[in-house]
Amino acid sequence: MSAARRTGPPAVLLVAFVLGALVLGTGGGRARGSTVARQPQAPAVAGASTTTAAPEAGPEITLALAGDTYFQGVLADRLAADPSTVLEGVRPVLEAADLAVVNLETAVGEGGRPEPKEFAFRAPPTALTALRSAGIDVASMANNHALDHGREALAETLAAERATGFPLVGIGVDEDEAYAPFTTDVRGRRVAVVAATQVLDGSLAAAWTATDGQGGVASARRVERLAAAVREADAGSDTVVVFLHWGVEEQSCPSGDQRELARVMVEAGADVVVGSHAHRVLGGGRLGDAYVHYGLGNFAFHPRDAEAARTGVLELRIGDDGVVGSRWRPGRIEGRLPRLLEGEDAAAELAHWEGLRACTGLRP
């Protein structure tokens, strides 16, 4: 297995990337994984007591995770007007996290032709600028829209990643790159993000799946290949996040396939397993020592109905013992833009979300 890893500096420094000095990713100018710097131990002192103090706990870090994001309709208009303000309404919450991740549900580029499917999405490279400006640090592109405009757009997507320095995960020039994690040091903790999709349109699945000789997206249907990627990420990181495109559209309970895949991911070493695709918010909670959220819902996306307009940001606190705290920040989508709720509205939505856990088999 290739040792290639998409690598970034601490999330708070992502805006300081300079193309040519440091470009995220693997291959074609992408950076290789780096060794985590450890604090040296003090040397033993002759005649001193052999009693050693318990090691100090490392600093906690925070993750912010959100769902399906694209740039159609009013979002395209806002992107054309000013990429830096497209998602300004949720920027404070995303920027406050040490690492923020979303699912980017679109091809990125100007070329290519729409694939033979009902919906084919595309956004210009400034979409990546908009994500960064919103406080987002990395985006999963392991989904059923990443190649909506074919291989020309795939090449443009990867070129946009290199040109902007904004990291994408779950997509690549071959399977090693598609399954490679994004890794970054966050205040002394090494965090890896792996992404894959269970969902690919039947007639396009083979053409879109990354292989040794073909670019595309990481497939979660290749369960052992994905589990191997998670194990490799776990071996070189303190915290592993797996971001999946999975589930059944318009269903608010996880499928059996989702629950089984979550179990496999946790056994492989994932500390956090999240995902989207159903265009519904699903429940979240504990699975063993890990935290699983089966459906983050839409984020910046057109909601077909009131249920699809439910959204939110999952905030997780990570410490020496893994996930030590969680918070669902509920919201509503208005005009394809997410708006986080406050007061009684937030309390009502939070109670609704808590109730969604009942069909997940997860613990609070």
Show the residue positions of the predicted features.
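Acidic, metal/ion-coordinating pockets
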Residues: A3-P364
